[in-house]
């Protein structure tokens, strides 16, 4: 990948570079994904998650920008793995952009084949929100991480992480949310990363409190704050596959253990034991096969240590990076003895059609987001947990790129909020249109047997019809852009998932599209879980009037 040193920043204000606000939204969100405040390696078009890119290469990026600038309001741009391939006449209620990223026929859906295609310039890895142009920085996963640790606290620690120590690793674009999510729940956390730049970035953005290169110092600080029952987050420079076994040997067992290293990609995401970043980069280039094998061996040691900690009493869970699968394939037959975070903590929310709903102020004015915060606090005042999240986010979350907010809203709530936002744009309360979207990690848009659909009640973990149906219904209902991706979160061969974005531009046409899309999208989550036999989903469907032909 050619590196290009240029600073990309989304335009602000109300002056259009395109022929309509929906096209403008797509352009600004693509550019926002590559803002240095947002992206992990913008010079390589990498947004987050190892090699999750916004466009296939710089030539494709420039062609996408040019296409969006000339796209009519009754045309649709097609993007194939980060490359613009066609513009067709459609209609004003159709999506302005349709994206398909990283999709491979199942028999060939593996990293080796993907890398062959990538080398030839035929494919890119879109992760989830990188290639679908709706990444908002670490805040994008923060509330989900907060909810996960909050539910762990409710199940195991009397509702709070006060006086507990969490041990984790991985402080990239996704994992970087962990330190703040733990301290928001009152706990102490040691978060390990091999890359000092990642820790520095989290400290700079106020997601992490302290930095150290010493395990002894990290433990001393952690013990001090644990005894005081005060929250603190410590970024520890090192390799988790070395540090976790060392702690097991010393019989130092945390209360909670998880991991968010980029284990989904053994070549580009994980650093083997005994290698500096520079040495790893050299080996990756010279002998990728040996690199991958060393990575897998290190991951196996990492998982062995997590299992040992679980055996000694630590609440241990997988945070969706496929590290258990790698260890299992390497011969560690009990790798799946600790659960994934979705079946352990999140699935009841999915049954209610809840998931990570986000919105972005295209104006670039933080005041627009603060006004929408007030809407949440007013309209959902009976949901104290949600309101508490909004108040904490306002105080503690620093915007990256265009101002944005995330919160978990359910069926009915999303459409209600979307209607209000559109009205606020129409009457001038907000200074420019708002982009509404979500992560692909949502209640009805993913098939991922080692993550979102792990341990489904009816055994339908690997059924991938659901994300396809999700993308189809959102497209016909008028989402502004819709994406279908493969391999996000857990790597090639292990997931299919869909994303959607809808623009609230204040028009009556947008109001109708918002009502349709923000009903069908979370509705798919309820439908998917009703079909799998979850009683809570059935109750929710009946209460909300979701029409499911064979529901009993």
From Swiss-Prot:
Entry EC no(s): 4.2.1.49
Name listed for the protein in its UniProt record: Urocanate hydratase
GO cellular component, one term: cytoplasm
Domain of life where this protein originates: Bacteria
Record's cofactor remark: Binds 1 NAD(+) per subunit.
Cofactor annotation: NAD(+)
Main localisation: cytoplasm
Function, as annotated: Catalyzes the conversion of urocanate to 4-imidazolone-5-propionate.
Catalyzed reaction equations: 4-imidazolone-5-propanoate = trans-urocanate + H2O
UniProt source species: Bacillus cereus (strain G9842)
Residues of the active site: 407
InterPro entries per record: Urocanase, Urocanase-like, Urocanase_C, Urocanase_central_sf, Urocanase_CS, Urocanase_N, Urocanase_Rossmann-like, Urocanase_sf
GO BP annotations, alphabetical order: L-histidine catabolic process to glutamate and formamide; L-histidine catabolic process to glutamate and formate
Binding site for NAD(+): 49-50, 127, 173-175, 193, 239-240, 260-264, 270-271, 319, 489
Family in the record: Belongs to the urocanase family.
Pathway annotation: Amino-acid degradation; L-histidine degradation into L-glutamate; N-formimidoyl-L-glutamate from L-histidine: step 2/3
Enzyme category, top tier: lyase
Coiled-coil parts of chain: none
Keywords: Cytoplasm, Histidine metabolism, Lyase, NAD
Species classification: Bacteria, Bacillati, Bacillota, Bacilli, Bacillales
A Pfam family the protein falls into: Urocanase_N
Single GO term (MF): urocanate hydratase activity
